[in-house]
Amino acid sequence: IIFHDAEALWQLGVSESGQFMRSMAGAPGNRSIIRIGPAGANLVPTACINVDTYRHFGRLGAGAVFGSKNLKGLVICGEKDFDIKNPPEYNKLYSEIYDKATKTNLMAKYHELGTPKNVLPLNKINALPSYNLKQSNYEYADKISGEAFAEEVLARKVSCSGCPIGCVHVGGLRKLFDAGYEYEYAGVSYDHELVFSLGSQVGMKNTSDVLNLINETEEVGLDAISCGVILGFMTEALVRGDIKITDTLVELNFGETAGYLAAIRHLASPPNDFYREIGRGLYNYTRKKADGSHDYALHLGGLEMAGYFTGPAHLAGGVTGIRHSHLDNAGYSIDQKLLKDAAQLSAKTVAEKIIEEEVIRSVYTSLVICLFAREVYDLETVCRALAALDIHKTPDELKAASSKILKVKLELREKMGFKLENFPLSERYFETPSPYGLIKREFTDEILKHYGELIKNI
């Protein structure tokens, strides 16, 4: 382990920091570089950690943890290989999984348009949060859809190391950097969550404006989902008079990038108490306010919502997710699968589905399996893959281990003071139509009640 003085890099953006670290580290191709931007350096609780430029430890403030330790970044290098006990069997299974991923339609969505393919289908069923969820469909959805990004700005596709899919979609952002028509291109990765948070949530009407906001958010090292949701809240709060221009220091209007670009920089480097407070997240900012701003603050379980407004399972799943992630139990997917039976839907059924999915996904997250590839790696395939490494488990044993892991996480969360009743859902969730019509608070509360009872028995 080698330590380097990072004082000269401390307030640099993510890209420039990465360039310096790459030049210092050597060994191209055999390393991973993670680093923070100014947001983490300034201990902003919504700061993230950038991982190899296009990926992130994105949520829950990991960037601020790095900053609190005076740690600008890490470069991990290594060349060690692992011995495979049965190479022929390993190679056979590898080829089978590779073909399953590349020669079937299981991963086609992620390679072709990527997750922004969700934009138009969600918009069609009134499930795309827009204008701080004043609307659940967006009149400019076709202008910021996956199709629009692919046709207008997609420059290349990138994969995580060892993966053949290329799900990371990188757009080309044309940037003016000096007078005399001096331009440069920046590669900016985009996905559905960012197209929501820095697109429909704040009223952007074209792909370039969305990329511009994403690029600024990436450079300063903020959680892009939280950042966009906070910006949408601030815009509405200004209109309502719950905050003033003396707080925001800039005018914020849906669809106008200039104010948002400045506000993003202020969130990362807070110039006043307002930005210091709201940078802690909407739950912390609104819970002590008497101005009614909690009623339109879009958080679930204390964390800003993801880009779906599919129904009650997404709301309940967002509150209960063990990692505070919409991907813990995919409530948004449960909503869509159960929509055809909406009239007969029971709260207990939804709670059971949430827990069932949480257990299965805990298998994948514990084994560091990409959740995009969950249909490639069914539990039988996971067991065969482990066996190729001389680790022998059955699907039932994996689920039993996952349940134990989930139980330990729940116990830890309880010891740290987390209680479902401390995170009431904002009124906005029950005012805006979803695919289920207006969601009833009583029904969502009933789901959470059943969840609390059922989770004790996992």
Where are these regions (language model features)?
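Well-ordered mid-protein domain cores that form the structural environment of catalytic cofactors
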Residues: I1-N30, R35
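Extended C-terminal regions of large enzymes
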Residues: R22-L60, F66-I458
